[in-house]
Design a protein with these regions (language model features):
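Short, surface-exposed ligand-recognition loops at beta-strand->loop->(often short) alpha-helix junctions
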Residues: 72-83, 206-219
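Short, flexible loop/turn elements at secondary-structure junctions
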Residues: 207-211, 253-257, 320-323, 382-385, ...
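Short alpha-helical segments and helix-capping/turn motifs at coil-helix boundaries
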Residues: 187-191, 255-257, 294-305, 362-366, ...
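Substrate-binding/access-modulating region of protease and related hydrolase catalytic domains
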Residues: 218, 387-515
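Extracellular S/T/G-rich loop segment that most often corresponds to the catalytic His/Ser-adjacent loop
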Residues: 322-329, 493-545
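Subtilisin-like serine protease catalytic core
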Residues: 304-338, 344-403, 425-427, 441-442, ...
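A general structural signal for short secondary-structure junctions and capping/turn motifs
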Residues: 195, 241, 306-309, 369-371, ...
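Autoinhibitory propeptides
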Residues: 2-57, 61, 68-73, 90-199, ...
Length: 545
C-alpha cells in the first residue's frame, strides 16, 4: 500500500555544472610583512612565555606528579594545509582545529575583493589547538627565533613558516574560553545571590580528549584531586566516547568556592587561586541537569480523531519525555519502551512534552483537518524525567547523568538490543529529537551531542530529525513602542528582520541542531491553531510567515 511507504522521498543525485560567467577567485587574505609580524608576535610570545612560567609556579605542588602543560591557541588568517604534522613534529599534541569567520579587519589583516582591493569584511581563518609541555614550548620558541632571523626552518617543520606569516594571535587556552565564552561566569553570578555558601553547585567539566587512555585516566585523577582540595567532589563516573573524542566528568563545589572565583576574577589581577579553573586539561565548564524541553500551558484544540487499528511495525521513533499513552489521540498508536521505568517518576499532569511531540509525529497539526494519522506504530523510548526541584517539574536529564550516554544507549537498544533483550525496533528509519541544550549555543565546533548524532546516524543508517527549540531571549528592536507602532506593517517586518540580522552572532542554534548528518527543523511565524489571545504581546512580524 502507498500509505506504508517511507515518509521521505529524495531526488536522484545529479551533477550540476557551475554557473557561467566570471569565476570567483578565492584567495588568502592580506597579511602583514615579515618585519611587522616579528614586531607583533614577539610581544605575544613573550606574554605566552610569562603566562606559562606563572602557571608552572602556581601548580607546583598542587597535584602530585602533575606535569605542567598548556593548550596553545593559534589563530591564523586564511588557511594552512597539513599543519597537524608540523605540530606533532615538535612534540606538541594535536587537539583540533576549526574555522573562524569573525576576525576584525585592520591595517594588517583584511580580505580583498576580486580586484585585489581591501574590503571591510570580517577576516576568515582557522583556529588550531595543541597541547604541549615545557620541551614543546622550547621547540616552538626555537622555530620562532629561526623564522624571526630569516633562517631556514628544519625539514618537516617548514609549515611553521606559513603559520608565523599568517598568525593573528597566539595565546594559552584559559578562563576566557573555559568559563566566560560558555556563559558560566554570568550564570553563576545570577545563581549565587540567594544561595547558601555551603550549598553544593553542580556542573560539568569537558576535558580535552587525549588519544592515550592512560592520559585520559590521569586527567580524571587530576580533576578529582583539584576538586577535593577545595571541598568539592566528582559525581558519578566519567563519560568517554572514544569514537567521537568526548571526555567529561560531573562535579560539584561549595557555592563559596564559586563565589571566590567570581570575586578573584573581578579583582585587579583577574586571576584565581583555585587551580581547578586553570587546569590545562579542562576545555569547558558547563551547567548540568538543564531543562531540555520547553512546554507551555494552554488549552488544546477540539478536533476529530481518526479511529482504526494500527499494527504495522514502526519506522519512526521518538526520544523525549514519557508520553500519555492512554491519551485519546495516542491510544494504540505508540510502542512505549521504558527500560529504566522513568514513567514512575511522573505525576499526573507531568507528561506534557512527550505527549505533545508524540501527537505531532502521529497526527501532524490536527487543527488543519487534512493530515491522516500515521498508519504505523511509533516507537517511543523516554530519555528525560521530571525535575522534582524545579517549580513546574520541567523535564530534564539528572545532574549525574550524561544525556549523550542516554541517547547512545537508547539507539543501541533499538538496533542491537541490551543485555538479554533483543533489538527493540530494528525497522526504525527516522528518530525525532525535539529537545535542545539552552546552555550550549553553537560556538566554533560541533558539540559532543551533535557529534554523537552524526556517528549514530552513520553507524545505524538512521536519520535524526532535530528541532532544538526557539530562541528564548527578547528581541531588541532599537525603537520605542510608540515609534514601532507608527510604522506600516511591511516596514515593521523589514525593521525587525534587520534587527534580528544585526544580532545573529548571539542568536545561535542550540546543540545538537548543528549535527551534520541530521535534519534540523526550523519554524515559521504561523500555525494552524486558529486565533489566540495576544494579551499585552505585540506581533513583531504582522502578516509574515
Amino acid at each position: 500500500m502507498a500509505t506504508s511507504l517511507p515518509l521521505l522521498m529524495f531526488p536522484q543525485a545529479r551533477t550540476i555544472p557551475p554557473p557561467k560567467g566570471r569565476p570567483i577567485v578565492i584567495g588568502q587574505p592580506h597579511v602583514p610583512g615579515h618585519g611587522k609580524q616579528v614586531e607583533r608576535l614577539d610581544a605575544q610570545l613573550t606574554t605566552l612565555q610569562q603566562d606559562f612560567e606563572r602557571y608552572k609556579a602556581s601548580v607546583s605542588g598542587s597535584v602530585a606528579g602533575l606535569e605542567p602543560e598548556t593548550v596553545l591557541v593559534i589563530e591564523i588568517a586564511g588557511s594552512v594545509n597539513e599543519f597537524r604534522q608540523a605540530v606533532e613534529a615538535i612534540g606538541l599534541e594535536w587537539m583540533g582545529e576549526w574555522d573562524i569567520d569573525d576576525i576584525p579587519p585592520d591595517e594588517d589583516f583584511f580580505e580583498r575583493n576580486t580586484k585585489g582591493e581591501r574590503t571591510n569584511k570580517a577576516v576568515k581563518g582557522r583556529m588550531f589547538l595543541s597541547l604541549g609541555n615545557e620541551a614543546g614550548m622550547r621547540e616552538l620558541l626555537s622555530l620562532w627565533e629561526k623564522w624571526r632571523d630569516n633562517k631556514t626552518l628544519p625539514s618537516g617543520k617548514t609549515k611553521w613558516r606559513d603559520v608565523f606569516n599568517q598568525t593573528v594571535q597566539i595565546r594559552r587556552w584559559g578562563i576566557e574560553e573555559a568559563l566566560r565564552e560558555t556563559g558560566m561566569l554570568d550564570r553563576w553570578q545570577d545563581l549565587l545571590n540567594p544561595i547558601n555558601p555551603a550549598q553544593a553547585i553542580r556542573f560539568q567539566i569537558e576535558l580535552f580528549y587525549r588519544r592515550s587512555e592512560d592520559r585520559r585516566r590521569q586527567s580524571e585523577r587530576n580533576v578529582a584531586t583539584l576538586l577535593h582540595s577545595r571541598s568539592g567532589d566528582q559525581k558519578g563516573g566519567a563519560g568517554a566516547l572514544s569514537i567521537m573524542a568526548i571526555h567529561a566528568v560531573k562535579a560539584e563545589l561549595p557555592a563559596e568556592r564559586i563565589q571566590q572565583l567570581l570575586n578573584e576574577l573581578e579583582s585587579e589581577s583577574h586571576d584565581t587561586d583555585i587551580q581547578l579553573f586553570k587546569f590545562h586539561g579542562v576545555m569547558y565548564f558547563r551547567p548540568t541537569g538543564q531543562s531540555l524541553a520547553v512546554t507551555e500551558d494552554g488549552e488544546g484544540v477540539d478536533t476529530e480523531i481518526a479511529e482504526g487499528v494500527v499494527d504495522l511495525p514502526p519506522i519512526a521513533a521518538i526520544l523525549d519525555g514519557v508520553p500519555n499513552v492512554q491519551h485519546q489521540a495516542l491510544k494504540g498508536r505508540l510502542l512505549l519502551d521504558d527500560p529504566d521505568n522513568l514513567s514512575a517518576q511522573y505525576q499526573p499532569g507531568d507528561r506534557k512534552h512527550g505527549t505533545a511531540m508524540a501527537s505531532l509525529v502521529v497526527h501532524g497539526e490536527m487543527a488543519d483537518g487534512q493530515a491522516d494519522p500515521l498508519p504505523r506504530l511509533v516507537y517511543v523510548l523516554p530519555i528525560m524525567q521530571p525535575d522534582p526541584h524545579s517549580m513546574n517539574r520541567s523535564e530534564h536529564v539528572p545532574d549525574e547523568v550524561f544525556f549523550e550516554d542516554r541517547i547512545a544507549r537508547a539507539v543501541r537498544r533499538m538496533f542491537e538490543g541490551e543485555g538479554a533483550a533483543p533489538a527493540q525496533a530494528p525497522t526504525i528509519c527516522v528518530i525525532n529529537l525535539s529537545i535542545g541544550d539552552p546552555s550550549r549555543p553553537f560556538i566554533h565546533t560541533p558539540s559532543p551531542w551533535a557529534r554523537l548524532l552524526d556517528w549514530l546516524s552513520w553507524k545505524y543508517r538512521v536519520l535524526f530529525c532535530v528541532s532544538a527549540g526557539n530562541y528564548p531571549e527578547a528581541i531588541d528592536i532599537a525603537l520605542s513602542g510608540t515609534d514601532y507602532l507608527a510604522l506600516t506593517d511591511p516596514k515593521k517586518v523589514e525593521h525587525v528582520l534587520k534587527c534580528i540580522q544585526a544580532q545573529l552572532s548571539g542568536r545561535r542554534i542550540l546543540s545538537p541542531a548543528e549535527a551534520i548528518n541530521a535534519i534540523t527543523v526550523g519554524a515559521t511565524h504561523a500555525d494552524n491553531g486558529g486565533n489566540y489571545y495576544q494579551g499585552q504581546r505585540t506581533d513583531l512580524l504582522p502578516g509574515a510567515s
